[in-house]
Structures are given as structure tokens and as C-alpha cells.
Amino acid sequence: MKLPIYLDYSATCPVDPRVAEKMVQYMTMDGTFGNPASRSHRYGWQAEEAVDTAREQIADLINADPREIVFTSGATESDNLAIKGAAHFYSKKGKHVITCKTEHKAVLDPCRQLEREGFEVTYLEPESNGLVDLSKLQAAMREDTVLVSIMHVNNEIGVIQDITAIGDLCRERKIVFHVDAAQSAGKLPIDVQEMKVDLISFSAHKAYGPKGIGALYVRRKPRIRLEAQMHGGGHERGFRSGTLPTHQIVGMGEAFRVAKEDMQKDYDHALALRNRLLDGVKDLEAVTVNGDLEQRVPHNLNVSFAFVEGESLLMSLKDLAVSSGSACTSASLEPSYVLRALGLDDELAHSSVRFSFGRFTTEAEIDYAIEQIRVAVTKLRDMSPLWDMYKEGIDLSTVEWAHH
């Protein structure tokens, strides 16, 4: 068993060997290394053909037209292009945007930028299980609402939003609907014909592809217009200039092809591992699963161990690669903004750990993890005076602490 055990698949996945093998063929003199925009010779044509194949593989996973796929450097860029691009293009119609407080920073920060430019943004409060209440969303919609951005699967708590229902609400009112699907592509079926979604962000590295490549689905019927954010040679039909990185695109295409093929197998594998881990730790007392356990991808388990500091727990679990919060914000010692939005108090939000597993995680690794978690939580609680008070039946919320 390789230590530390990797249980942070929501942060990134290792590249699948099938993907890596394919990518290597598009880099050196022996392979297809040309620029896909070079139209005057075979090196360019072959590279363009490889890009077209990958575009089809990505479109296949979501039942889209390959012409609706725009390559970007990742989901962050896709989110920026979708949110700023749509808001700017449709700003004559209105300047109101709706999103949710538990979105990824790559959605929240572009919304903050729009606010600085004079747009108004409504940040919906999720329910305590992490889901958006459709009636609250409907109530927030106005005549001047031009864009709604709600993620498919949350990166910290793994809950699945009802994208189909939200899409219906938006389509009725002719509001552009953007979805960040970085955490759901390859894990859940996505059908753009059934879901009335206009813009969808994808990332390769969350689906066993390489880092640094992503895509944005831009609906053609009804046609969605965007203002480009990256200007230059007019690549990607003017949506996103910049030489296409053939090897990364090929990697993303292959990763999405494999994901489509293995989706059910991967899902069942993750579900078995998730249940095994939860069964192994849930009797530890004062253990809370954050986010809805039913409407959730099985690849994620976010748990709070009361009376244990999350950072201390991570340091005690040195043989497990896990995170508290998401990798994008875990450098900050603030409690997770996602968990606080669910109504968790700072103590519980601070004591949370996200375990995420995937294609290469084994049962033996989960069993080892359970053993490590049990030892660490018990040891840290033994050192905590708060735990002793809790065990004595003292209601900690009533205690008056002295201020020094």
C-alpha cells in the first residue's frame, strides 16, 4: 500500500494510464505535434483532426453537438468566460445575476467583479442540506435578471442540485443558465438536450485527465452569445483565442471517453467505498455528515468530528491525503464558507474533513483510513476539556467564557 493514501480526488485525480499513453503521442517529433491552426500542411491537419476527435468525445458524454464545445484552460476560465461573457453581452437587457453562496470561488469571484462593474448579484442561501430551494430561486428572479449560475455538484459537500428543474425555470423566463459541472462530469449522466442549460463548465483533471485544460459548452439552439474574455488570433470561433494544446485536448477527450464507458462501474465502486468508510466511523459519537446524504455523489464524504480541530486532525492523519474545505481555500484558516452557509457553527465547520475517493482507491486503503481516523479522533478528544464537559452533559452553548 502506497502511503500517504490519496483520499482527495475532489481536488484532483491522477491521470488515467490510458489517457497518459494517448497524450504522449501528441508531443514529440515522432508523434502529431503540429499546431491545429496550421492549415497549410499535414502536421496541422493531423493535429486538427485529433482536436476534432476530442471535441466529439466530450460532446458525446453530454449529448451535445461538437460545435458547442469551446476549449479553455480549465473550469475556472470556463466559469469566467460564461459569467462575465454572458453578463456583458446581455447587459442591455438587464444587470441582475443570481447565484448561490456555496458556489466555487471561480463563480463567486467573477460575480463580485460584475458587482464592481455595476451589476447586482443575488446570493441565495442554501437549505441546511446544501440544496437550493427552487421557490427561493423563483422569488429572486426579476425582469432584469440575465443570468443564473448554479453548480451541478458541490466540490466540498458533493450535493447534487436539481439542474433540470432550475433549467425549466430559467428557460420559461428567457434567463441564461450557467452550470459549473467540474465535479459532476463523468460521475453523473449529463444530457444537455434534457437539461435546459445554456452554458456548462468542465475540467479535465477532475475526471482523470490532465490539469490545465477544460471546456465550456455553449448552446447553439437557442443560440447563446458571449463576449470573449481572451482576445487574439480568434481561435475557438472567436470565443477563446490562443493556440490549442493538442496533447492536453487529446487527454481530455480520452478521459471523457473512458468516463462515459466506466461511469456506472466508477459510481458503484465509489458508493461501496463511501459506505464502507461511513460505517467505519459513524459510531464515534458526535459525528455529522455535512450535506444531504441521498442527493449526493458517492465520491465525496464530508464529515465533522465535534470537539476535534480540523487542522489538528489533518496533522494527526499524516498517512492520509485529505483536506478540510476545498484545495482552493484550504490555505486559509477561516472555517469553510460552504459549511457556514449551511448554518453550521464555526466549531463544527472547523472540525470538518473532506474525504473523496475514486477509480484507483481500494477497500484496503479505506480500512486503513478508518483505523487511522478512529485512533486520531479518540486521541484528540482525550486531550480536549470541551469533550470532557460534553461527556458530563454540560451544554457548552450556555457556558460563559472568561475574556482575557
UniProtKB/Swiss-Prot annotation:
Its EC number is 2.8.1.7. It catalyses: (sulfur carrier)-H + L-cysteine = (sulfur carrier)-SH + L-alanine. [2Fe-2S] cluster binds at residue 328. Pathway: Cofactor biosynthesis; iron-sulfur cluster biosynthesis. One of its GO terms (molecular function) is pyridoxal phosphate binding. The modification N6-(pyridoxal phosphate)lysine is found at residue 206. One of its GO terms (cellular component) is L-cysteine desulfurase complex. InterPro entries: Aminotrans_V_dom, Aminotrans_V_PyrdxlP_BS, Cys_deSase_IscS, Cysteine_dSase, PyrdxlP-dep_Trfase, PyrdxlP-dep_Trfase_major, PyrdxlP-dep_Trfase_small. The active site is at 328 (cysteine persulfide intermediate). Its cofactor is pyridoxal 5'-phosphate. It holds the Pfam family Aminotran_5. It is found in: Cytoplasm. SUPFAM superfamilies: PLP-dependent transferases. Homodimer. Forms a heterotetramer with IscU, interacts with other sulfur acceptors. Belongs to the class-V pyridoxal-phosphate-dependent aminotransferase family. NifS/IscS subfamily. Master enzyme that delivers sulfur to a number of partners involved in Fe-S cluster assembly, tRNA modification or cofactor biosynthesis. Catalyzes the removal of elemental sulfur atoms from cysteine to produce alanine. Functions as a sulfur delivery protein for Fe-S cluster synthesis onto IscU, an Fe-S scaffold assembly protein, as well as other S acceptor proteins. This is Cysteine desulfurase IscS.
